[in-house]
Amino acid sequence: MQISSRSGFGYFSYGIRLALTPGIRRFVVLPLLANIILVGGAMYYLFSHLDTWISEWIGQLPSFLSWLSYVLWPLLALTILATFSYFFSTLANFIASPFNGLLAEKVEQHLSGERIGEEGVWALVKDVPRILSREWRKLLYVLPKALGLFLLLLIPALGQTLGPIAWFLFTAWMLAIQYCDYPFDNHKISFHDMRNTLKQNQSKAYGFGMLVAFFTSIPIVNLFIVPVAVCGATAMWVMEFKIQHSPLRQ
């Protein structure tokens, strides 16, 4: 199946079509259920505390910046929603990572017409230790940067103004890495090489990640994002990145 090059935004919307495609839909179910259970519970807790958290945070602004509260409230709300959703989506992805990898494999097979690796339950079971190890690698990459940004948020004025923007950009980049990594990992391409490939294509990576981050922050909609993002990221791999890692190019 031939597909044309798209923007990062375009690959996300294409992921919606792919997730609904006959033959792929059945591989969407388990990643979807994991996300609904974890992210749904997190959103319920978040919305019962969101207003209090934002009011306390904005209350730390110096009096001469109090006029910014009208601008910062929606920005902080979006940032907290995206961060919460990213954290619990990451947890859901960790649990469902073998099934996300399988979904990416089936999407690539659908788009390219080529079989990717072994098939069957035993092949999936054999891959579980490697897949979970890869998820730990992603967490080790994220945590130091997330800690640094969290400390930025604690700085008066700076944390309330630049902090949310920095968090949103960071979340977009990490979501691009999270979902693009599944097809890369299916081909045993190292985390380092995957990250460098995305850095060389930052406009597509950030465009894709920003749209995922935006929809991840929308209640109800965010429950369905994981399989859509896996499908869209795999389409991006097939069209944009796969040729760069072809054995003929090594």
Swiss-Prot record:
Annotated protein name in UniProt: Sulfate transporter CysZ
A single BP term in Gene Ontology: sulfate assimilation
Keyword Cell membrane attached: yes
Organism: Vibrio cholerae serotype O1 (strain ATCC 39315 / El Tor Inaba N16961)
GO CC terms: plasma membrane
Signal peptide residue numbers: none
Record-stated family: Belongs to the CysZ family.
Domain of life of the source: Bacteria
Gene name of this polypeptide: cysZ
Annotated compartments: Cell inner membrane
